[in-house]
Regions:
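Sec-dependent signal peptide recognition
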Residues: 1-8
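Compact alpha-helical subdomains of small soluble proteins
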Residues: 48-109
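N-terminal signal peptide c-region/cleavage motif recognized by signal peptidases
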Residues: 14-16
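N-terminal secretory signal peptides
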Residues: 19-57
């Protein structure tokens, strides 16, 4: 499942980070996907609905490409099973965030 998410994240994030022209810009560009990944996976693991996530994303006043990225991250997050206890939930959140950030950084190199 993580491999599928990794490939999905690369495909989703790559167009967003194409404009990054140096290592610092790459890190800055990758912070949005990383933070969004954490937010949507936290809601997923805490029992929030995907529909509510999509409504919240749609209400954000951000660039359309970032809104599209956020929607794709939410769909990917809800493809991961919800965990039954807080430690496993926290691990799933951290893993999803780390994979998103890593894949973004790889896409900018």
């Amino acid at each position: 499942m993580i491999r599928i998410l990794a490939v999905t994240a690369i495909l989703v994030i790559a167009p967003v980070v194409q404009a990054a022209d140096d290592n610092r810009a790459s890190k800055d560009v990758c912070m949005f996907p990383s933070q969004m990944a954490k937010a949507v996976m936290t809601q997923r693991q805490r029992g929030g609905s995907l529909a509510a996530q999509m409504e919240k994303i749609d209400s954000l006043e951000i660039q359309p490409v970032l809104k599209d990225l956020a929607r794709k991250l939410a769909v990917a997050a809800y493809g991961v099973p919800a965990q039954s206890n807080e430690n496993l939930q926290d691990a799933a959140i951290t893993e999803f965030q780390n994979q998103t950030y890593l894949n973004c950084l790889k896409g900018t190199q």
